[in-house]
A protein has these predicted regions:
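Flexible loop/turn segments at secondary-structure boundaries
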Residues: 15-21, 87-90, 114-118
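Acidic, Ser/Thr/Pro-rich beta/coil linker or hinge segments at domain junctions
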Residues: 99-144
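Short Pro-Gly-centered flexible turn/kink motifs
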Residues: 142-153
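Preference for extracellular/luminal or secreted protein segments
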Residues: 67-72, 119-122, 153
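Residues that act as N-cap/strand-start positions at coil-to-secondary-structure junctions
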Residues: 61-65, 88, 134-137, 145
Length: 154
């Protein structure tokens, strides 16, 4: 095989020539984490063992919006994951029972912009941004275009 000596290309025939989305870009002297690396890391680092009902009003008409909420027994935290695959910002009307007041939450946001990628020259162009916010689960939530947002709270 032509690319047998290259580890990244070794299994090229098994990819069925679909779009190849690497998690790392390996150069001669450096390795750069891509947005897909950070996306996989956000899923891996924010798992839960108890699934909860996080209702979104009028979600039937929304395409490419995904919401899941759960409780992690190990860290004793609630985790809310929101994914917007649309190219425009979306406002969601939430209705989560049992959370009647505002709470402090850790917010992790990964936003993708067309044409903006991590490269060896700009290794941190796309990466998650972490902040502490006040969250009200009975008010509207804004989702940036092409983004994944994770809220962690007690």
């Amino acid at each position: 095989p032509l690319f047998a000596e290259r580890p990244v290309m070794r299994h090229w025939d098994f990819l069925e020539h679909r779009i190849f989305l690497p998690m790392l870009i390996n150069g001669v002297d450096s390795s750069v984490k891509t947005s897909f690396f950070y996306l996989a890391k956000m899923f891996r680092d924010n798992t839960f063992d108890v699934c909860l009902d996080a209702a979104i009003k009028d979600i039937e008409g929304l395409q490419n919006i995904f919401v899941t909420m759960g409780y992690d027994s190990e860290s004793k935290e609630y985790i809310l994951k929101l994914i917007n695959l649309r190219k425009q910002e979306v406002v969601l009307q939430t209705a989560v029972k049992g959370f009647g007041k505002k709470i402090q939450a850790q917010k992790i946001t990964l936003s993708l912009e067309p044409g903006k990628n991590n490269t060896p020259e700009m290794p941190d162009a796309v990466k998650p941004v972490q902040s502490t916010v006040t969250l009200d689960l009975n008010k509207d939530l804004q989702l940036e275009a092409s983004s994944m947002i994770v809220y962690r709270f007690k």
